[in-house]
Amino acid sequence: MKNLAQSKYSSALETVRNLKEKYGTSWNAINSESAARMVTQNRFKTGLDIAKYTAAIMRKDMAAYDADTANYTQSLGCWHGFVAQQKMIAVKKHHKTTSKKYLYLSGWMVAALRSEFGPLPDQSMHEKTAVPSLISEIYDFLRQADAIELNDLFKRLENGEDVQDQIDNFETHIVPIIADIDAGFGNEEATYLLTKKMIEAGACAIQIENQVSDAKQCGHQDGKVTVPHEDFIAKLNAIRYAFLELGVDDGIIVARTDSEGAGLTQKLPVSQEPGDLASKYLAFVEAEEIGINDAKEDDVLLKREGKLVRPVRLANGLYKFKEGSNIDRVVLDCITSLQNGADLLWIETPTPNVQQIATMVNRVKEVVPNAKLVYNNSPSFNWTLNFRNQVFEEMLAEGENMTGYDLNNLMDEVYDTSELSYRADKKIKTFQVDGAREAGIFHHLITLPTYHTTALHMNDLTEGYFGEEGMLAYVKGVQRQEIRKGVSCVKHQRMAGSDLGDAHKTFFAGDKALKAGGTNNTSNQFDVSEKPKKVKAIVEKVA
């Protein structure tokens, strides 16, 4: 949000001046302008301030999407505050605004990268406090990005540059975060307590899934077990109560269903009357008709349409759903969640197929017309292969000769310049636009991009650095790219807060301050504006 820095500075300046007058000479060392600068550079004082601010942004964006599906939003998953900071700095640099660009906190990455137990699978085995801790860390880094950029602008203003308008219209790096609470880490009270911590850390949107908490699996793996709707609704209520208690009245709940790929349920809900929610859930459970004399000791029996049936129960006590019931269960999950307090939906799917997603969402919209989806553009999908397969089937249906393609080997590089590859890549490129328009997708996210980019970059750097290229691998592949692309971290001392700290030391100690940013600081080598002066000096010396 813009146009607040100026009023913030003026208000802070007046406040400090009044305080100095109130407390007299004991405050003589406090410079009103310096204090006002520090207030301006730290707009958000608490995580709750952030949650309220970002919730309002999401609500506005949701309304904009309802009016025009071109107004969809996006995010990338981040596993460290620094990663989130660099993402938002890059967003501002390349796109000139943070509008409709969010952050995503993935439970998968918390488990894999942030647990004190070491790397873990996505099964809710990591300590639950790691989730709010990461949210807090992310917003600490984003607030520092604000402070660094504004500090630079104030320095330029002091040096006579005309940057007042940039200060007055400064856009914060703080954006909404959709935070993954898995299945709630326990019962509804546990969900409520953890949600409070996440909101207090700054989260305005909580994503919760309908799996059994202590048997949770990654949405793209087998063995998923879902809970009856009554249990899930209790957790939706717990999240809403947490938002209301903390004064984040616009807080967003994202209800995720894993039913598309889940074939098991842990327990059978109690139906109070035919056709109620529990009855609808029980209708999906696979059962075999039996006579009363065929029942075994301790069998669980149900009466269905006047007949006795025995639910199919596995050796571990779990009950099995009917084959082919998954899509109907997804639709019922979504409708039920929206009718019981959820704001957005999340449907885990086996492949990224717009038409398949739209088929489910459109059924939901028949009951809840403004239903909107958060969709996981997951790295668990082989995007290249999925879309080449889709296009292969389309081209075949169009009557094209496909004998030149091996359907079992479409990932082969030999097809990279083919018509099939061109059409597949075009569909990947427009997937998010198409999904927003046709499948009700309000928010597109990639859960684990920075997990994969870290691995890829280390693969590329180590190949050359420990090989024939040596130091050139780093210089050519990293530093030179940072310089030429204007990546802020090329001056890593500044990004870590060194210049900001020097400014603070000057405020605190005046001329006695021992600062890091002097002429002997090697970061000066990256100051492009000084290069012509150095070259000129060398030429004059040679002459």
Question: What spans do the regions from the language model cover?
Answer:
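Terpene synthase/cyclase
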Residues: 2-4
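Alpha/beta enzyme core
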Residues: 7-439, 445, 505, 509-526, ...
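Non-catalytic helical/linker scaffolds that mediate oligomerization, partner binding
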Residues: 243, 278, 463-469, 543
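Substrate-binding cleft of secreted/luminal carbohydrate-active enzymes
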Residues: 429-462, 469-502
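C-terminal functional modules
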Residues: 476-543
